A protein has these predicted regions:
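A generic "folded-domain core" signal
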Residues: 22-174
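Sec/Tat signal peptide C-region and signal peptidase I cleavage site
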Residues: 16-22
Length: 174
């Protein structure tokens, strides 16, 4: 089921985020403007990834300073699991139980479902719609709520996204 794939994807995405940050020198295979591509061989996985250009955290309508882990937006290919172009987002904190993340790309909105510190679209079809919007858009704004009630708004540049998504797909597409 797609939800089971999400759960497996969550574990892999967490591992990838760590790998992306900790082993950038050895795993990064391409970069363009605000996006990069990482590749690992066993099992073969490729992902295009970007970090936000701006983050705003609010509680009760006031801007607050909070500690967050890595904040990343991914597009991932895992050929051995038949995953192609899976969108995922980590906000660097546990999301509020049962909450969703709103992704706004140049006025087109999408809903991502949360589990732990990660969020994904509901279906592979939705992944593809988001990828199309990313390729046409200038930025993506992701709004979410933490388990502590903090509202977060992360703005990601989409400059370089098309080239890096296509690069990752070429490396790992089936």
């Amino acid at each position: 089921s797609y939800l089971a794939t999400f759960t497996l994807g969550a574990t892999a995405a967490i591992a990838m985020a760590g790998a992306a940050m900790a082993q950038e020198v050895t795993n990064r295979v391409a970069a363009d403007t605000d996006w990069a591509v990482f590749e690992v061989e066993s099992p073969k996985e490729c992902w295009a990834v970007t970090a936000p250009k701006e983050t705003v955290n609010t509680r009760d309508g006031r801007v607050v300073s909070v500690r967050r882990g890595d904040i990343l937006l991914f597009v991932t290919w895992r050929p051995e699991k038949s995953i192609a172009g899976e969108i995922s987002f980590t906000g660097g904190y546990p999301f509020a139980e049962g909450s969703t993340v709103t992704m706004d790309i140049s006025g087109t909105t999408f809903e991502l479902f949360t589990e732990g510190e990660y969020a994904w679209p509901a279906t592979p079809t939705e992944d593809q719609k988001i990828i199309s919007a990313i390729k046409r858009g200038a930025n993506a704004v992701l709004t979410a709520r933490s388990s502590r009630g903090t509202q977060t708004k992360d703005t990601f540049s989409l400059l370089g996204a098309t080239a890096m998504i296509e690069d990752a797909e070429q490396r790992c597409g089936s």
